[in-house]
A protein has these predicted regions:
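N-terminal leader/targeting and accessory segments in enzymes
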Residues: 1-91, 232, 282, 286-288, ...
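ATP-dependent carboxylate-amine ligase
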Residues: 1-15, 36-39, 52, 296-309, ...
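Phosphate-binding loop of NTP-binding sites
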Residues: 10-13, 89-237, 241-252, 301-302, ...
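Acidic, Mg2+-coordinating active-site environments of NTP-dependent enzymes
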Residues: 13, 68-76, 170, 185, ...
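Receiver (REC) domain switch/active-site residues of two-component response regulators
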Residues: 63, 195, 394
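Short, ordered loop/turn segments at secondary-structure junctions
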Residues: 69-71, 138-139, 181, 202, ...
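Short, active-site-adjacent cap segments at secondary-structure transitions
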Residues: 72-73, 140-143, 183-185, 240-244, ...
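Short acidic-hydrophobic, aromatic-tinged amphipathic segments that line or gate anion-handling sites
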Residues: 79-84, 257-258, 426-429, 434
């Protein structure tokens, strides 16, 4: 894009006299990534203000600076002043990437719990149905079947546009993406339209960022308020915030409600059987909450025009998301406890998973729960997670999660405040030792839930990420137990 076209697209408040000749780009928001000819856009972040790095960007070779304030420089740089760079970055990133979002049918899934599983189920089902689909989410980033690293639930607008461009070039027709409340509040999903948007549920999470549950809900609603009349919203009306999400939106609304258009036919440790709009789905996924995930995935695929029976058949044969109620076992050993790894890191999610395991357990089968809470996040949920564990687990080991910059022992102390009694509660700060202890203590008949990190392959301590995977650690402990090592 040349400077003239850039200015015309932006429609700025002011521009400097200097206008560089020829093409400019790429677009960057981190001055450390600036190369010769870059367009640097200064974003006011929650911790860092990009306007502090205008001089650094120029020094590194930026030819265009986009900012929210008057800025003078002697350098041969075009300075473009706008009212709000955050609202501009999404549309501009799309424009400079060739508007890849316009060439994809985009499905957005938002909610506190179930985003990853629902989005993954839609991706897997559409792929099974023969569509060319890509996926962006917490666990996986997939361009068709190629897996890439996924760092955030929803990437920044520049990375998002670049990913979409790669997807289009690879032949993708659909993009299924998780949409976080942070991304919506920070306008990270601007510059393209959603074909279908889905709401799973809403409960306490991220209140360190949004401050109140009302602000958190309002951030989620941005996704639905932005839908066009030709788009569709799939909304879980069994959640107390379903009506709020649907209120006043322009799109068509497809409502999910168990007892109305969906039913749970059976729910056991072997899996689920549900009916949605008259179509039966038999899945290896377990738990009442997965009934909602399967039903929403079904309704999303139906909104995209697929045959109901074919959707049901596809969903009956897909595995779901890694680290979501994922079973860990040894191929050759059956005389070992059943180990489940799950990402549950909110009070609601932990309660749902434990309740599911409790409902499916047999007589004299104990449930061990290993969990912690993340540092530098909403501390109010820590004691609530303890209450959830106490209600459904027989033996509890409280440990570290991702303490980040916090002291893990202080996080554990916050959690302990939620226990009415600690008779069956042990604290072990080392997560590896906690997992080993649970597997050492459990009998072959018991169930062990390792909650909080799911698919993650790291543990963040003092701001650094160290290799750590609950599934690999559990497998190591199971191998030791199988050899009689405890």
């Amino acid at each position: 894009m040349n400077t003239h076209d850039l200015i015309e697209f932006i429609n700025p408040l002011n521009t400097s006299r200097f206008k560089p000749e020829g093409e400019v780009g790429p677009l960057v928001q981190d001055s450390r990534q600036v190369t010769e000819g870059s367009v640097f856009i200064a974003i006011r972040g929650t911790e860092v203000d990009g306007h502090m790095f205008l001089e650094d960007a120029i020094h590194r070779g930026a030819k265009v600076i986009i900012c929210e304030e008057s800025y003078y420089t002697d350098a041969e740089v075009c300075v473009i002043e706008v009212e709000n760079t955050r609202l501009l970055i999404g549309p501009l990133a799309q424009k400079m990437a060739g508007n890849p979002g316009d060439k994809l049918k985009i499905i957005g899934v938002t909610g506190t719990n179930g985003k990853t599983t629902t989005a993954t189920l839609v991706y897997q089902a559409l792929t099974k149905l023969g569509d060319k689909v890509s996926l962006l989410g917490t666990v996986e980033k997939k361009i068709l079947t190629e897996s890439l690293d996924s760092k955030l639930t929803t990437a920044d607008p520049i990375e998002l546009a670049a990913d979409m461009k790669k997807m289009v070039e690879a032949g993708s027709e659909y993009l299924v993406m998780e949409v976080s409340s942070h991304a919506l509040h920070q306008a990270r999903v601007g510059g393209f339209d959603f074909k279908v948007a889905a709401f799973t549920n809403l409960s306490q999470d991220h209140l360190d960022y949004h401050e109140t549950i009302e602000e958190y809900a309002a951030a989620k609603k941005i996704l639905f308020d932005g839908l066009k009349p030709e788009s569709s919203a799939v909304i879980n009306m069994d959640d107390s915030y379903g009506v709020f999400m649907a209120d006043g939106i322009s799109s068509q609304i497809s409502e999910l409600s168990f007892g109305k258009n969906a039913q749970v036919l059976s729910n056991s440790a072997q899996g689920l059987k549900i009916s949605v709009d008259g179509s039966a789905i038999s899945s290896s996924l377990v738990g009442h909450f997965n009934a909602f995930n399967l039903a929403e995935a079904f309704m999303i695929c139906n909104e995209l025009g697929h045959d109901k029976q074919r959707i049901a058949s596809a969903l009956s044969s897909v595995p779901g998301a890694p680290g979501r109620m994922e079973s860990v076992s040894l191929d050759s050993e059956t005389d070992l406890p059943k180990v489940i790894v799950d990402y549950a890191h909110t009070p609601d999610a932990l309660e749902n998973v434990l309740k599911t395991l409790s409902e499916s357990r047999t007589q004299n089968q104990f449930i061990y729960c290993v969990f912690g809470a993340g540092g530098d996040r909403d501390s109010g949920k820590r004691p609530k997670m303890a209450k959830a564990a106490l209600e459904f687990a027989d033996e509890i080991i409280v440990t570290s999660d991702n303490p980040r910059t916090e002291n893990p022992d202080l996080i554990i102390a916050d959690i302990l405040q939620g226990f009415e009694n600690t008779d069956n509660v042990v604290t072990i700060t080392s997560r590896k030792e906690a997992i080993f202890k649970a597997i050492e203590l459990a009998s072959s008949n018991d169930i062990i839930l390792i909650a909080g990190k799911g698919h993650e392959d790291y543990q963040e301590i003092d701001g650094k990420r160290y290799p750590f995977d609950d599934r690999l650690v559990a497998k190591e402990a199971l191998e030791l137990k199988a050899k009689g090592g405890f």
